[in-house]
A protein has these predicted regions:
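Bacterial N-terminal signal peptides that target proteins for export
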Residues: 3-14
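Bacterial N-terminal signal peptides
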Residues: 15-24
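Structural motif corresponding to the intra-repeat A-B loop/turn of tetratricopeptide repeats
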Residues: 67, 100, 138, 142, ...
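Catalytic glycan-binding domains that act on GlcNAc-containing polysaccharides
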Residues: 82-83, 91, 263, 270-272, ...
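Generic helix N-cap/helix-start motif at coil->alpha-helix transitions
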Residues: 49-57, 68-69, 82-90, 109-111, ...
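N-terminal leader/linker segments that initiate helical-solenoid repeat arrays
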Residues: 30-92, 99-101, 391-411, 419
Length: 652
């Protein structure tokens, strides 16, 4: 169970022992649950890796670097002269000299010589690319464009929004066409959460250079305001005539809808349009049917390009929820191209909208754009085309190909970092090693990860193949000896359970969340106590939640409980496991008519839960195919969700 809230799951069981679980609304609920056998032992079978004193000092150095504590980092690094990860020791020593305590780049020259020496010594490594990323932020802050440009050309990952904004600032300072740069910025300036100082400088300068209109700048600022970054919003676009409407819509969109209906005529056509877009977004996130009306008013006025990425996406969702296919089509056609292509959802729903209009040939073209993707919408697109959703033919690799992976430097370093529970650094090393691998090499690397029980790396690595696949690696079934009897005893679908675990923890036994969920099934402590009591697990304490069998027992039973509580719907139960059963019931209650499961999933208000449900159901479909070797229908699994009055639940 995960961050947004505690989670839950239930499923019917024919005949068996009955749990004394009485929901206030329905006593019969208790008769749907079968009491499971309890784990034989609470003791974890996993042996803790040996951590040396030097390792502990290294971990302390990492923490000092995170805090940009220059003195502490220098002190610890001086005692790790012969430590095996000499590059990390050097990086953790140098990095605090480049950033202040708040995390901002210092913009001075004090660390330059050390950075250059580091980049030369560790050229071509993952950590050198990380160091270059950091230095680019420093170079950008001090407007050292010649050096910035030289280093930016060597930045391999190029995944930092601020660095991209500095790259555009560099081009602007050198006289490149501001209109072209403004167009290029549209694919960068999508999420204000990542803007930082660089992007806040870029937008006003593009306006001053004539490349961007004041209205476009205000739209970018408004996107920041929608997310609560009001100071940033003013820096980006200046004063916005609809600032108060944005604030009101966030607080009470229904009231704002009523009020603006009376006062809209006081505003310009442009400001009316963007205001209706903002109001529509926040109504849609409340699943208010008036969202469709608000967006229709915006559509009539135009100015789609001035809506934030968030508003553009929720415009589609509002249309889907209302079954307003004309709005769905218009919303997708009016999207920023960068927003439209980043998620296959919009290609799929555009195809569906075309199909409603009778444009079958064009609909088919859209489905074919994504039918080679092995994800939620790729599966749905294949079904629209009448194609199979069966797992592709398996490509096998030989032992010799797998053996060669053991000597790969990135994998060896990654293993040691994982042993110290430094997953971020371990993933960096592992993923860097995967660059430029062929499909067969990726499968060999995934098999190697399986040998050493790094199941999250099995999934991550096998997931990268393009033409040659092995879905038994993409969708592995570790801990099957433990999980199968638990699921069988309570009649819980094994493929769905694996699909959920794959999403929850990627099979990392000691996975933990910031809110306290832990283990393979990310069970919250309070939920664990509740379930343990209901199934008769005596003497349970939360320190036993780290035991694999205990975690699987409690998580599976909770999943089963929410499934029963939510009438056997995998979509609703998956949502409940992530966000809580009360929320899932509320989202169902707000439907105005029976709705296909795919639309329900796409219109879940919480981003985390929306992504979660789609991934769990997609995973479950492929797990079922891998386990049974038969074609599977994702549409059937999604089913239809009918509106139903939300009843109180005892479940956490």
């Amino acid at each position: 169970m995960k961050s947004a809230a505690q989670k839950s799951k239930y499923q019917r069981i024919a005949g068996a022992l009955i749990l004394g679980l009485a929901l206030a609304a329905n006593n019969a609920f208790a008769e749907k649950i079968k009491k499971p056998k309890l784990p034989k032992s609470y003791e974890s079978k996993a042996a803790a890796p040996e951590i040396t004193d030097a390792d502990r000092m290294f971990i302390d150095l990492r923490e000092a670097a995170k805090k940009n504590d220059v003195f502490r980092a220098q002190q610890l690094a001086s005692n790790l002269v012969n430590y095996p990860f000499d590059d990390y020791v050097a990086y953790f020593r140098i990095k605090p000299q480049m950033f202040d305590s708040a995390g901002g780049p210092r913009g001075d020259y004090s660390a330059d010589a050390q950075v250059v020496a580091f980049l030369n010594q560790y050229q071509g490594t993952a950590l050198a690319d990380r160091m270059r990323n950091d230095w680019l932020l420093v170079l950008g802050k001090r407007k050292d464009w010649s050096r910035f440009d030289a280093e930016y050309a060597k930045f391999v990952l190029d995944d930092d929004t601020q660095v991209k904004c500095y790259a555009l600032l560099s081009k602007l300072s050198q006289g490149e066409n501001p209109t072209k740069l403004a167009i290029d910025s549209r694919s960068v300036l999508l999420d204000p959460s990542y803007f930082g100082q660089a992007c806040q400088e870029l937008v006003p300068l593009l306006v001053a250079a004539g490349g961007m209109t004041p209205s476009e700048a205000k739209a970018i600022g408004r996107a920041a305001s929608e997310k609560g970054f009001d100071t940033m919003a003013r820096r980006l676009g200046g004063e916005d005539p609809i600032t108060e409407i944005v604030k009101a819509a966030k607080a009470d969109p229904a009231k704002t809808y009523r009020d603006f209906s009376q006062s809209a005529s006081r505003y310009s056509k442009e400001n009316q349009a963007v205001a209706w877009g903002v109001i529509g977004q926040f109504l849609a996130k409340k699943l208010d049917p008036n969202a469709d009306d608000a967006y229709r008013l915006q559509q009539e006025l135009g100015y789609n390009e001035l809506l934030s990425a968030e508003s553009q996406e929720w415009k589609v969702r509002a249309g889907l929820r209302a079954k307003d296919w004309a709005l769905v089509k218009n919303a997708i056609e009016g999207m920023n191209p960068a927003v439209r292509v980043r998620d296959p959802a919009w290609t799929y729903w555009y195809g569906r909208a075309l199909k409603v209009e009778g444009q079958d040939a064009k609909a088919k073209e859209n489905f074919e754009l994504i039918d080679n993707q092995y994800n939620f919408y790729g599966q749905l697109a294949r079904e629209e085309l009448g194609k199979s959703n069966q797992a592709p033919a398996r490509t096998k690799v030989g032992d010799q190909e797998i053996d060669t992976m053991a000597s790969r430097k990135g994998f060896m370093r990654g293993e040691r970092l994982y042993a110290m529970n430094l997953r971020f650094e371990g993933n960096r090393e592992w993923n860097w090693e995967l660059r430029n691998m062929t499909d067969k090499q990726l499968l060999a690397a995934a098999e190697y990860a399986k040998r050493i029980h790094l199941y999250d790396r099995v999934v991550n690595t096998a997931d990268r193949t393009k033409e040659e696949h092995d879905f038994s690696l993409r969708y592995p079934t570790p801990f099957r000896d433990e999980l199968s009897p638990i699921a069988r005893q309570i009649d819980l679908n094994l493929a769905w359970t694996y699909g959920l675990i794959r999403q929850e923890s990627r099979f990392i036994i000691n996975a933990s969340s910031s809110v306290g969920a832990s283990g393979l099934m990310q069970v919250m402590p309070n939920t664990a106590k509740y379930v343990a009591k209901k199934i008769g697990m005596t003497n349970y304490t939360n320190d036993k939640l780290s035991d694999t069998n205990t975690n699987l027992t409690l998580g599976s039973n909770y999943l089963n409980m929410v499934l029963v509580d939510l009438d056997g719907s995998w979509v609703l139960a998956s949502a409940a496991y992530n966000a809580g059963p009360s929320r899932a019931k509320l989202w169902r209650e707000r439907l105005t008519s029976p709705t296909e499961g795919a639309i329900f999933a796409e219109t879940i208000p919480f981003t985390e839960t929306r992504v979660y449900v789609k991934n769990v159901l997609s995973n479950a479909n492929y797990y079922s195919s891998v386990m049974h070797g038969k074609e599977q229908s994702l549409k059937q699994r999604l089913g239809t969700i009918a509106p139903k009055t939300a009843t109180q639940t005892e479940l956490p």
